[in-house]
């Protein structure tokens, strides 16, 4: 065990739709889990959200969506807030302790995003409007959340109802 090539070998290439989602959820549930309280993100974000290119000063982080340089240590929302990539109002509170889902975001961008689904049409928020690569990063996080908690639903709705998130 432990070989990366074996990790997802139980997932058949022939699976799709709900069958694939259930198989991925089952595989995901076998991983070792460490639970965090939402408040813990104030402490841990500065250690996991580092600049991969090493271009920002020590003790700082890159804000999600716009790469704004924000304070590493929690500063009571002066420069950054905890962005719920899958908004709590859309069921994201079920995964809010997961370090994959909550990201440091500048206060301005966090407010601008609100709880909109992602997209490029009116009433949605484009995660790549400032830095294009965040479209893919946000989509991967959304897929991960739907696999981690099967009550979260990915679809193409742009309305603010239920546990829906889509228009990726």
Where does each model-flagged region fall?
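Domain-level detector of nuclease and nuclease-like folds
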Residues: 68-168
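N-terminal module-boundary/linker segments of secreted carbohydrate-active enzymes
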Residues: 1-69
